[in-house]
């Protein structure tokens, strides 16, 4: 599998046996926007609404203008990274003031396996400037090639990112529950500082490969949605206010989904006071293996999905949605849309939602 990532519309360990597809005529389709080399993320840049950036795992960022791919990549750091399996160039983020500063950030694994976040500057709207690289964060990831995390997201001036627990099975070093380790965490950093120092924001995560902020459900109280990849039994969705997530413990490796974790290297006691997922689903559902966390849709041109959370599973391939609540979820549905090996969702500056397939295609969710 590319990613070792890892909940149901309920607040208990019970998992629904099946979900119901959306009825015909509810109006969601897929529009193919291009084909790329192992695309793993899609993003827009504030101030440039006609541009769309596609991250390729091998180390390049492609740019589309007005829906058309440009010939030269926006960025090529293939010489700086290790790629393959769960490693590679994994995401890109543009700050709110990008049009003025031209600074942007990428998350990747280097040849030694370390997790790195670097800053670059763009010389034009469609090309990064050579020689502009500045190291922001480096986190040792010395033993295993999996569970690297990979997401970057801005909320205000803070750059948030999620790290995996260091890999293997059951988090043998207990990184996720150790507040002094930077693995198995949601972290944030102020990249404007001269020497940026990452802060632990939340602990107890296994591999939060994709997370997002929900600013549409309650604009005054932004919420955080984390697709945290499970190990043997369950995939989970964590959803809470950003304020409540600060200092929160999401439970791994004492818990997997709603249940005590009982696989390899189990035995970590439940620390108590953990934030439980709002939704979990078993690997027995359609051959599932790894949640691909998405977005709470803010695009009003998609009324069938407006304020609903969209997500998928790497192995199952079905696109699904649900209504997230702070203490549960409701209305979990198949969208009647399936793609091979979904690797990520993405969002542009107009809140339009995209989904990438590791096989190459990238699609936009459109009304129909």
Spans of features found by a protein language model:
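Beta-propeller blade termini and top-face loops
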Residues: 163-167, 174, 179, 188, ...
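Conserved blade-ending motifs and adjacent loop-strand segments that build the rim/top face
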Residues: 328-349
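Surface-exposed loop and turn segments in beta-propeller and other repeat-based domains
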Residues: 72-87, 132-148, 182, 187, ...
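Short, contiguous, pocket-lining structural segments
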Residues: 174-182, 199-207, 212, 229
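Beta-propeller blade signature
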Residues: 117-125, 175-191, 241
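Acidic, Gly/Ser/Thr-rich repeat motifs that build Ca2+-stabilized beta-propeller blades
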Residues: 10-170, 210-234, 287-323, 327, ...
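Bacterial N-terminal signal peptides
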Residues: 1-9
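Beta-propeller fold recognition
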Residues: 235, 239, 243-258
């Amino acid at each position: 599998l590319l990613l070792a990532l890892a909940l149901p519309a309920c607040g208990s360990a019970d998992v629904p046996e099946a979900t119901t597809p959306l009825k015909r005529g509810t109006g969601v389709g897929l529009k193919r926007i291009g084909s790329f080399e192992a695309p793993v993320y899609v993003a827009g840049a504030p101030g440039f609404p006609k541009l769309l950036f596609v991250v390729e795992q091998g180390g390049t960022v492609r740019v589309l203008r007005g829906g058309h791919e440009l010939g030269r990549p926006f960025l090529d750091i293939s010489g700086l990274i290790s790629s393959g399996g769960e490693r590679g160039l994994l995401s890109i983020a543009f700050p709110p003031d990008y049009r003025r500063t031209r600074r942007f950030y990428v998350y990747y694994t280097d040849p030694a396996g370390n997790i790195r976040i670097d800053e670059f500057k763009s010389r034009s709207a469609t090309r990064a400037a050579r020689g502009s690289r500045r190291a922001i964060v480096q986190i040792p990831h010395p033993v295993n090639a999996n569970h690297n995390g990979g997401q970057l997201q801005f909320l205000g001036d803070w750059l948030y990112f999620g790290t995996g627990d260091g890999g293997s099975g059951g988090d043998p070093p207990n990184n996720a529950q150790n507040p002094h380790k930077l693995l198995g965490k949601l972290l944030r950093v102020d990249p404007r500082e001269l020497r940026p120092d990452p802060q632990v924001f939340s602990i107890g995560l296994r591999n939060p490969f994709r997370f997002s902020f929900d600013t549409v459900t309650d604009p005054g109280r932004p919420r955080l949605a984390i697709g945290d990849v499970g190990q043997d039994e369950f995939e989970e969705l964590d959803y809470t206010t950003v304020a409540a997530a600060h200092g929160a413990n999401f439970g791994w490796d004492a818990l997997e989904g709603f249940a005590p974790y009982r696989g390899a290297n189990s035995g970590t006691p439940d620390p108590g006071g953990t934030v439980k997922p709002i939704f979990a689903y078993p690997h027995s559902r359609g051959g599932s293996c790894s949640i691909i966390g998405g977005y709470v849709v803010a695009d009003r041109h998609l009324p069938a999905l407006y304020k609903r959370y969209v997500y998928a599973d790497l192995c199952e391939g079905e696109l699904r949605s649900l209504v997230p609540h702070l203490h549960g979820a409701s209305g979990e549905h198949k969208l009647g849309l399936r793609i091979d090996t979904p690797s990520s969702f993405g969002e542009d500056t107009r809140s339009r939602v995209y989904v990438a397939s590791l096989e190459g295609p990238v699609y936009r969710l459109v009304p129909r």
